[in-house]
Amino acid sequence: MHWSEIIADRIIKRNPNKEEYVCAAGISPSGSIHIGNFRDIATSYFVVRALIKKGKKAKLLFSWDEFDRMRKVPVNVAAIDSDMEKYIGCPYVDVKNPFDTEEKTYAEYFEHEFERSIVKFGINMDYRHQAEMYRSGKYTEHILHSLKKRGEIFDILASHRTQPVQEGEREAYYPVSIYCSECGKDTTKIVSLSDDCTQAEYTCACGHKGSFDFTKDFNCKLAWKIDWPMRWMYEGVDFEPGGKDHASPHGSYDTSKDIAKKIFGYEPPLFQGYEFIGIKGTTGKMSGSSGLNLTPETLLKIYEPEVILWLYSKTEPLKAFDFCFDDGILRQYFEFDKMYSAVKDGTANDAQKDIMYNTTVGDRELETVPMGLLVQLGSVVDFNVPMLETVFEKIGTPYKSEQFSARLDKAKYWLENCAPDQVNRLRAGRNWEVYETLNETQKAEIKSLFEYISAGGYDLDELNKKLYAIPKEINGEDLDEKALKTIQGAFFKNVYKLLIDKEKGPRLYLFLFAIDPQRYVGLLDFSYPKTEEEAKAEELAKVEDVVENEDKHVYGEADAFVPFKDEQVSIDAFEKLDLRVCEILKAQEIRKSHSCLKLTLDDGSGENRVIVSSIKSEYTCEQLVGKKIIVIANLEPARFAGVQSNGMLLAATNGACGCQVVFVPDCVPAGTQIK
């Protein structure tokens, strides 16, 4: 049974005769809504579908928490309008729209952006706009009730925290924030409340002092852990998921659950915590308010909506999975296609059927043209659709444009924006630099292939056999199997390098058969000398390589000089530090961290050392492996993102250069002490 059906059964068991079940989700429009938030929606959506599958009426209630205060300005928003910080403290619904669009407010802009992408998933939601709910007075009686119960609410909150209650803290607590009538911000403090809890006096950080009548003035909002259970009660919510941080002991759900029962007299909904989403192949903290985010719309440029839903459906909520911007996406498409086809042809098991049940988008029928094949062959024909149709016809898979055009767009976007190193393009001229490194036997292999291709008259199977036969024909028939495989592998690499400047590419026999031989056969012909044009092209390529390898980072101005510390350190104190040269053997991304890398080091002791460093935004793993660095080796171990770090590397951080690790010349042995 699918995990969503297990949850649905629990919901029905709690209240078997309810007319309509309510599954909830909600997001604050702090910026572009990132894909991590989408798990909130997907989890509730699948439970709604499971309830409907069981013959029940159910809806997905979605709250736009646009009445929340603006906490900070996302980086991408600040880049458009540097004056947005003045809105910090105002509700999102009152913040201006900094973009040149028709939406009236900041909240509306990001809400519409997200809603447009949700339509593409075929998900129907019943929207609640919390600013309208509060300001229309619909929550007034519950706000008054909360004010009357403020002492009890404080006691519940205090029971879920570790720090002791300070004297006078309970008396000064109010479960509601007032938005100032003068500046519009929530930087207010209630200084008095009438006995019937209807009238309040408040002061604001802006200097304004005012009166507030909770029966007539609605520009106020309950604190999060009171607002949440109040809305459960108001909407009759039966189920709501949340990030695993909310699910922790004494976290938001535990606290709100107690408030729902003891303050609002409502049995809290079933809650399902979920693991956060990982991102492979890109960096940057994934959050809406930081500006470094990956929205559903962004993912839809490389993923079909069904594949995104499939990833959520096949993964239990408390298990992590990754969206892949590297070639892991090709594996995901392959696995999706395999399961989709099994369901379609009737060979799927019950578990596969349950997973795929949640992935349908309206009446869409998918064509499972292999994404890997589109990636491999698409770039070779410059994503020309008629040419690709011809290629597919030649290799015995006669897909038509209407079958692959949608996926082809995603393959092209992925290659050009996420994996440009995997683009396969034929060279403009012969690769003399590679050819001149070959020995005579290898050159003879290339000549044999050139002659075979030039002669033509072969089919796909004959070409495949010939590619494996050429090394054997040139090197002799008496090679053992291991030696033959080594020579064949080297031959394939040489052909790839001569044709596309890479050591590997699409399956070679498909590649050579699919493309018009006249486009590439000349690249294998070294029977005449290097031309003047080829010599000039080589020189130009060397210059371009130098330019390409120059530092591409764009930094700002240097930080202001920080005065030296007054406190001096004695030689004895300095000698307590054990600074060692270490070689980086392995660098790995840490799934739970958006900024840290796990580095495995050779510290000269004979046993590897592991440290964690927040340099992910500055260096790729490939750039670090093999480098030598300086590490404080006797630093007290500490845990970061679930990994124990046994030391700290030395690096310089400045606005003019970012974070630059101090590297050591390769001639210095690992384990050398810095004295």
Where are each of the predicted segments found?
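N-terminal catalytic cores of NTP/NDP-binding nucleotidyl/phosphoryl-transfer enzymes
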Residues: 1-78, 229-248, 603-607, 612-625, ...
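Conserved oxyanion/phosphate-binding beta-strand-loop segments in alpha/beta enzyme cores
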Residues: 1-19, 212-224, 581-589, 599
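A glycine-rich helix N-cap at a beta->alpha junction
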Residues: 81-103, 107, 114-117, 121
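Active-site cores that bind ATP or allylic diphosphates and position pyrophosphate for catalysis
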Residues: 123-296
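Catalytic adenosine-cofactor/nucleotide-binding cores of aminoacyl-tRNA synthetases and other
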Residues: 248, 253, 275-420, 500-540
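Helix-rich, typically C-terminal accessory recognition domains appended to large enzymatic cores
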Residues: 373-390, 439-521, 526-528, 632
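Small-residue-rich helix-loop
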Residues: 391-453, 460
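Phosphate-backbone binding interfaces of nucleic-acid-interacting proteins
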Residues: 536-675
